[in-house]
A protein has these predicted regions:
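Long, highly charged amphipathic alpha-helices
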Residues: 33, 106-110, 114, 351, ...
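Residues that flank catalytic or metal-binding motifs in active/ligand-binding sites
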Residues: 70, 173, 276, 366, ...
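Conserved hydrophobic/aromatic beta-strand scaffold that supports enzyme active sites
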Residues: 73-75, 176, 279, 381
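Feature captures hydrophobic
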Residues: 300-447
Length: 447
């Protein structure tokens, strides 16, 4: 459209008449006003973090991609009803998660609408889902809410990896709003951690994902609690695809599992546990009954979850499988495939710490040099010693086993270990050292 014709367009004429600068409030935005805007929208607490804060440096590139020119993050919390989360009836707990999640998203959307009307650019990424699933299994979320909330002074991470608000405890969901304006006053992290280190989350977790020394087994939590999300759903879909007929499908998947998956597809994906949140007594509004009678808390909250008869989903040979057997004889294990499957070498390197099973490595002391060729070229050193994993770029030290592999072949091998012999014969995977060490390596990363 020619410029003179564009200038004559009614929309352009009207826009030229309007003084747009009068709509946008002066910067920096008043922090008290912005906080009240969020509280009026339904938030229970609010904090502000500048984009240059070192605490969120690792997110800055992604945040700028989501909202070019972002300058401030508004972090807010929505309080959940505690007893709904504590009940062994997980349908009640999931209803609370879903309702509070929707409420959190509605708060964000309302605040964004108010700011947009003032010519302040803003977006509200989802509290949980939807995410950018085209990036799965790598980072699919737009913003990592937990580090932002901690930086904003809305709590600290507990041993169970949930943010514990000083007043509301861990019975909260988190939201973040990105805006292109500065704020008059930013909030800072609180000076103490509300976590009591009572270790009730360690006791209640059915998969052993939380260890008393602070170690977190991500894959144990992900495999069970998120069974009806993302990778777990993919594993179920593969069971459908591989079944020869209805009888074969029912031999793989129980009627209750099929109904549960239908329920998640129809009413929102349901968590299998989240018991770590259920039993946590931290927070000023929460701690009173626990301080008054810890035995009653154990009897009324912790023990019913521990004693609940249920299926726990585990990867064969994982630490979680052994934990359920040792600690929860009333719970059943069901073998499922590892759903955190890398589709690139970069994804593989990022994922190794997430799927490492340290109890399977208790007798190991070995260094591995990997050289990947083909579609992706990369060298890494993996050291497993004293139940600890270290992954470093490049080759360092003297290895116990050298592995040279074509990238595509190695990724196929991870998905289907039985093809190793074929790959060795074809020289697409080459070993220098004892093959036993490759077997030991695989034991630490079961699939």
């Amino acid at each position: 459209m020619a410029r003179n014709r564009l200038e004559d367009h009614p929309t352009v004429v009207q826009a030229r008449r309007r003084d747009r600068t009068a709509d946008r409030p002066a910067e920096p935005l008043d922090a008290s006003w912005l906080r009240q805007l969020c509280l009026d929208a339904g938030a229970d607490d609010v904090g502000f973090v500048e984009i240059d804060r070192p605490d969120i440096a690792d997110q800055r590139e992604d945040l700028n991609a989501a909202l070019p020119g972002v300058r401030t993050l508004i972090s807010f919390v929505s309080r959940m009803n505690r007893e709904n989360i504590r009940t062994p009836a997980r349908s009640v707990a999931n209803l609370e998660f879903h309702h509070t999640g929707d409420h959190t998203n509605e708060i964000g959307r309302h605040v964004v609408g108010e700011l947009e009307a003032m010519d302040v650019r803003a977006i509200n990424p989802a509290m949980g889902f939807p995410m950018e699933m085209d990036k799965f299994p790598r980072k699919a979320w737009v913003v990592s809410h937990k580090p932002v909330a901690v930086a904003a002074g809305l709590g600290k991470m507990g041993i169970h990896r949930n943010v514990i608000h000083p007043k509301f405890g861990n019975f909260i969901l988190l939201g973040t709003i990105l805006i292109d304006a500065e704020v008059s006053e930013y909030t800072r992290p609180i000076e103490y951690n509300p976590c009591l280190e009572c270790k009730l989350c360690v006791t209640a977790c059915p998969t052993g994902a939380i260890a008393s020394d602070g170690h977190f087994n991500f894959s144990a939590c992900y495999t069970h609690n998120y069974r009806e999300f993302m990778g777990g759903f993919g594993d179920w879909a593969e069971q459908v695809a591989e079944s020869r007929n209805a009888h074969d499908y029912r031999s793989r998947v129980s009627d209750s599992e099929s109904a549960s998956m239908w329920q998640s597809l129809s009413f929102g994906a349901n968590y299998k546990a989240a018991y770590c949140m259920s039993v946590c007594p931290a927070g000023e509004d929460v701690i009173g009954p626990w301080l008054d009678n810890r035995k009653a808390h154990l009897t009324q909250v912790v023990r019913p979850l521990m004693d609940k008869e249920e299926t726990v989903y585990v990867v064969p040979g994982s630490d979680a499988e052994q934990h359920v057997t040792d600690r929860f004889p009333n719970k059943r294990t069901k073998h499922v495939a590892m759903s955190l499957r890398a589709n690139s070498i970069d994804g593989l390197v990022e994922g190794l710490p997430l799927i490492f099973q340290r109890e399977q490595a208790k007798d190991m002391s070995a260094t591995y040099h990997f050289t990947f060729t083909g579609d992706e070229s990369r060298q890494i050193t993996v050291t497993i010693r004293d139940r600890e994993l270290d992954v470093a770029d490049g080759h360092h030290g003297e290895p116990d086993l050298r592995i040279t592999a074509d990238t595509r072949t190695w990724l196929r091998f991870l998905a289907k270990p039985s093809m190793l012999a074929w790959a060795l014969v074809r020289r697409q995977i080459k070993l220098q050292g004892s093959p036993r060490l490759l077997r030991d390596f695989g034991r630490c990363f079961p699939s």
